[in-house]
Amino acid sequence: MFVHAHPDDEVISTGIALASYAAAPDTSVTLVTCTLGEEGEVLVPELINLRADRGDQLGGYRIGELAGSCAALGITDQRFLGGPGRWRDSGMIGTPANDHPRSLWRADLAEATAELVRIVRDVRPHVLVSYDSNGGYGHPDHIRAHQVTARAFTDAADPAFAPGTGEPWQVAKRYETAMPRSRAVAGFELFHDSADRNNPFAGLKSVDDLAMTLVDDADITAEISAPEFFDAKIAAMRAHRTQMAVDGFFFALADGIGQRAWGVEHFVLAAGTRGPGDGPDGRERDLLAGVAF
């Protein structure tokens, strides 16, 4: 089960993993999306009035984009935390959207956790995947998704927590998405001179100036490499057309580093027992490694 903050997050950091597990005959995948991404940019000129500061209709539109992404990745079980529209995109930290009464950032943590626990107890996954405590790059909704997922990992097994949401279930492992330092360095070397405003490397003097969390390569505990799903990931990215311009940074990165950038995804085991692995530094090549079924 993968828990993401907004539509499009599922493909950027976990599209390869989602597609590979969705295609495997003996596994199933559930994607939980916490908000509709109402505060996102609109990169399609004719759709500019969907923006939150105009018609405020972007969230509904992005439901359709998410459906297209899921179709490209082979995901057949996608759910919204608390139902579509229960919690709203909080925007970047320090913006007025943080204070919206329905923002995920302002959500009661126990209530939001109970909604994820409801899904966990229904699906009974062996693995949970979300972000690190910084949300990868400090976005309030990513931080909240981490908090909710970390608590649900423990609380789903507690019969005293949220009675009436199903039978208790102990998830075996919890992972956090990770950006290896070596990958960030490669991106910086290629793109720090780019003027694309969606390019996180633009104008930086050093890779350490990035807002995102970088993980030393030796601390990565799992990697999913499935180049056969590279095209599916790119197709899923294209489905999010309001968020990713086809001539913008994300696709330039795909062309520049290709499968080194988008064909391998990295994770850190945050809870549970590490399984066997034969990847670099003994990394697991399967998030289900060592799990007893």
Curated annotation (Swiss-Prot):
Zn(2+) binds at residues 6, 9, 142. It comes from the Bacteria. Pfam families: PIG-L. Binds 1 zinc ion per subunit. Its EC number is 3.5.1.103. GO terms for biological process: mycothiol biosynthetic process. InterPro entries: GlcNAc_PI_deacetylase-related, LmbE-like_dom_sf, Mycothiol_biosynthesis_MshB. It is an enzyme of class 3 (hydrolase). Keywords: Hydrolase, Metal-binding, Zinc. One of its GO terms (molecular function) is zinc ion binding. Its cofactor is Zn(2+). It catalyses: 1D-myo-inositol 2-acetamido-2-deoxy-alpha-D-glucopyranoside + H2O = 1D-myo-inositol 2-amino-2-deoxy-alpha-D-glucopyranoside + acetate. Signal peptide: none annotated. Belongs to the MshB deacetylase family. Catalyzes the deacetylation of 1D-myo-inositol 2-acetamido-2-deoxy-alpha-D-glucopyranoside (GlcNAc-Ins) in the mycothiol biosynthesis pathway. This is 1D-myo-inositol 2-acetamido-2-deoxy-alpha-D-glucopyranoside deacetylase 2. It comes from Frankia alni (strain DSM 45986 / CECT 9034 / ACN14a). The gene is mshB2.
